Amino acid sequence: MLTGAIVISVWAGINLVMGLVVLVSVLLVTPHPLISRIVFTEAELAQLTPKTTGTIRSLAILQNASVVASAVLVLVVVWVGLAHGEYWAWWTLLGTLTFLQAMQFAGDAAIGTKTLPASVLMTLLAIVGLVFAGLGLW
């Protein structure tokens, strides 16, 4: 169970750090979030209207703030519940991580699978963590 808790914590930690980096970047450094630079060329970014750029930035801020908040909540559930053998924590994590990773693939499909390797890696990490945690509980 502890191995699963650690692996899920790594998953959450990666999401937390990436979410914070992108959030700080969008708020303080660059007018275009990372996803814009993945999807659009520099020439295409230059042609975006301020309204379009503002909308993309707004969504990136909300999305990355949600990533950070979700990661913190996952860490709390892992170390308050799962690490102490609470079955509810495993079921909560199963539902939450499954939903989040499924939505990652849906979002990735919307941009032409440009972030597919990262989506696959994070999904595998979540699955491994859940399997080890489940084996430790049952």
Regions found by a protein language model. Give the residues of each.
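N-terminal signal-anchor transmembrane alpha helix
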Residues: 3-35
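Aromatic-anchored segments of alpha-helical transmembrane domains
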Residues: 97-105, 128-130
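Membrane-interface helix-boundary signature
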Residues: 1-8, 49-59, 86-90, 111, ...
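A loop-to-helix transmembrane entry motif
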Residues: 32-35, 51-69
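Core segments of transmembrane alpha-helices
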Residues: 15, 66-75
